[in-house]
Amino acid sequence: MAVQKSRKTPSKRGMRRSHNALTNPTLSEDQETGEIHLRHHITVDGYYRGKKVIKKTQDIQEINA
């Protein structure tokens, strides 16, 4: 069974963990509606970069009725 030659220092441990920090998600505001959404995701209204890209189910039901 392998045994380490010497113990790692707290400094080395910290340097190893330096990339493990969590960051807040980046949020954007839609150009048309002003709604806040995640970057590179559509809004709840179905807008992406100021353009309507998907219809909501309510809109589809109104068309079918």
Curated annotation (Swiss-Prot):
- Keyword Ribonucleoprotein: yes or no? yes
Q: Where are the transmembrane segments?
A: none
Keywords noted in UniProt: Ribonucleoprotein, Ribosomal protein
Query: Which residues fall in a compositionally biased region of kind Basic residues?
Result: 1-19
Q: Which GO terms describe its cellular component?
A: large ribosomal subunit
Q: Which SUPFAM superfamilies match?
A: Zn-binding ribosomal proteins
Q: Which GO terms describe its biological process?
A: translation
Q: Which GO terms describe its molecular function?
A: structural constituent of ribosome
Is the Ribonucleoprotein keyword given for this protein? yes
Disordered: region residues: 1-32
Tell me the InterPro entries matching this sequence. Answer: Ribosomal_bL32, Ribosomal_bL32_bact, Ribosomal_zn-bd
Specify the superkingdom: Bacteria
Give the family, as the similarity comment puts it.
Belongs to the bacterial ribosomal protein bL32 family.
Protein name stated in the entry? Large ribosomal subunit protein bL32
Where does this protein come from, organism-wise? Ruthia magnifica subsp. Calyptogena magnifica
Q: By which gene is this protein encoded? A: rpmF
